[in-house]
Amino acid sequence: MGLRQDIDKEGAIVIPVFNEEGNIRAIVEEVRRSGIAWDIVAVDDGSTDGSRELLEKLPVTLISHPVNLGYGAAVQTGLRHAVAAGYGTVVLMDADGQHIPSEIPNLLAALEKGADIVIGSRLLGNSSVYRIPFLRRMGIKFFSALAKILGGTKIYDVTSGFQAMRRNVAQFLAEEYPVDFPDAEVIISLGLRKFRIAEIPARFRRREHGISMYSNPIRAFYYPFKTILASFIVLLRIIRGKK
């Protein structure tokens, strides 16, 4: 798994992938057309639909999990690779096509203003090109309030996976990233540890192919309870000085 020599060593774009055969080629090509010459680190999380075979043919650094370990594990694998490779900046984006690569320069510009991590938000301004379903929007608001109460940081779109971060954040999350449904838990953990978190409007779009993991009713039911419990555990660990 050698790095290609034509890559700008300044940063990496980490894309966790699970069964995104219908979307991933377009995402990689769109990133390249945007003029961003950074390494694209695609972490295939045990896909069963041909995503890995497709990624092997694309201009990416491919890391494969032998089985599906979950979104958080895939992100953590990508961050660990980026840190080990010496990248100073990491962009995290999804493989489902909802995150628009041409928005990345805006995230980086906000990072340069002093933030440690920048969140691309669907809820600021007229940022989305699609309407977020009502229940999902209510869930985002709930976890935003939870992050404010527990982490002391007001972020409107705490479930956004479209982020740019400095190396210090990447190093921390490479070891502390939650395995399942990280969302608010990550924001709370970063807020409690006094990382500087910024949020800017970012355009999103609808998924064109495949099925979101949130469409699974069992996982959707489990999600809020797991996140609340994990968030309190993070708070208790910090209070007790274990981390």
Predicted regions and their residues:
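Hydrophobic helical membrane-anchoring modules
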Residues: 1-11, 152-153, 175-243
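Short beta-strand/loop segment that forms part of the nucleotide-sugar
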Residues: 15, 27-28, 37-47, 63, ...
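Short beta-strand-to-loop acidic/aromatic patch adjacent to the donor-nucleotide binding site
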Residues: 87-98
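Acceptor/aglycone-binding surface of glycosyltransferases and processive sugar-polymer synthases
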Residues: 65-84, 101-180, 207-229
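A conserved acidic beta->alpha catalytic loop
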Residues: 44-53, 97
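N-proximal low-complexity "stem/linker" segments adjacent to membrane-targeting elements
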Residues: 1-32
